[in-house]
A protein has these predicted regions:
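Feature marks extracellular polysaccharide-active and adherence modules
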Residues: 15, 29, 38, 58, ...
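Solvent-exposed loop/turn segments connecting transmembrane beta-strands
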Residues: 16-19, 45-49, 74-78, 104-107, ...
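Acidic/polar low-complexity surface segments
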Residues: 55, 100, 105-106, 130-144, ...
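Residues at the loop-to-beta-strand transition
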Residues: 12, 18, 32, 41, ...
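Transmembrane beta-strand segments that form the barrel wall of outer-membrane beta-barrel proteins
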Residues: 9-13, 37-43, 65-71, 96-101, ...
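Short, small-residue-biased leader/transition segments that mark boundaries at the very start
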Residues: 3-7
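Exposed, low-structure sequence patches enriched in small/polar residues
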Residues: 167-168, 174, 196-208, 225-248, ...
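Extended lipid/amphipathic-ligand handling interfaces
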Residues: 1-2, 22-30, 51-59, 80-89, ...
Length: 303
């Protein structure tokens, strides 16, 4: 009877019209055409390259199970995971355990304990300790949520959507909200459902917050509806602003101007040069602007 299993060792090369498999050690089933990979291996095709040391590859259906932090490279993206179910024909990779999707062109990384990526559509999904890192500029944006999605808008731009328990951090800001959306095309980060944004001594809160970024710095934060801002004075006192709409403008990494439009109210605790408080000032107006210098109120205009 013809032997089905072939055990091949040392500088193995399997040629196929669609790919070439290089391996240290593999078992090959001549009937099912399935190659069981037992050593460092590389599978090269027009669609990309696979690096693995353990798993199997169905040479008929172009499907595979890749184990032990294997890598699937397609263009400028690298998919890594403990266990990857990969279909080369559909471009779909499903990952269980320590998933990472690295976009080397856009300088972003999507991570989670479970997720999948479609090479053909550019859609990626991650959940269970899901994380997103954006490091195209000087400061890295760290984002965590229950569920993350990355949508490829075109060859250049990406759209990131985060759901449930969203937390993010960058050297000049940090925030929490229930859901969030970030578009690399216009560099605007949208925070929805009880969003809170912190910057140095300031805390911003409202119905929705849109953060407009220019290169590696924040240009301004737009708090839409039920806008509120608080600045920490000491353990018992906070300067406060509220209104229908609020825009906080940044210079460097700090707030330098805040505009409030519609039912504008303010409470401020003026300080002497030695830091002593000298009472409380309260205003109500249609519109309000404050200018900040060295994290202290410099000027206030109401109208």
């Amino acid at each position: 009877r013809r032997q089905r299993q072939m055990c091949i060792r040392d500088s193995v090369q399997v040629e196929n019209p669609d790919f070439t498999l290089y391996s240290d050690t593999l078992h090959y089933d001549t009937e099912s055409k399935v190659a069981t990979i037992l050593g460092p291996s590389v599978i090269v095709s027009d669609s990309g390259t696979i690096h693995t040391s353990r798993g199997w590859y169905d040479t008929v259906n172009n499907t595979s199970l890749l184990l032990d932090q294997s890598q699937v490279e397609s263009g400028e993206k690298i998919l890594i995971g403990d266990s990857i179910f990969y279909n080369r024909d559909t471009g779909m990779g499903e990952v269980y355990g320590n998933m990472s999707l690295i976009d080397t062109a856009q300088h972003v990384t999507l991570q989670g304990e479970y997720g999948y990526y479609n090479e053909q559509t550019g859609y990626a999904f991650a959940t269970d300790s899901a994380r997103f890192l954006e490091y195209s500029q000087g400061d890295t944006l760290f984002l965590h949520a229950d569920t993350l999605q990355m949508v490829t808008v075109d060859s250049v731009y990406r759209e990131i959507k985060a759901y449930y328990g969203v937390r993010f951090y960058r050297i000049d800001m940090q925030g929490v909200c229930d859901s969030m959306q970030f578009n690399t095309r216009d560099s605007v980060l949208y925070m929805y459902t009880e969003p809170v944004l912190w910057n140095e001594q300031y805390q911003l809160y409202g119905d929705t917050i849109a953060i407009y970024m220019n290169d590696s710095t924040i240009e301004y934060a737009h708090v839409i509806q039920f806008a509120f801002a608080a600045q920490h004075v000491d353990s018992s006192y906070y300067n406060q602003l509220k209104g229908n709409d609020l825009k906080a403008y940044f210079e460097g990494q700090a707030v330098h101007q805040i505009d409030v439009a519609g039912n504008a109210e303010s409470i401020f605790y003026p300080l002497e040069k030695d830091g002593a408080k000298v009472g409380m000032n309260e205003t109500k107006s249609g519109f309000l602007t404050i200018w900040v210098k060295d994290n202290k109120l410099d000027k206030l205009k109401i109208w």
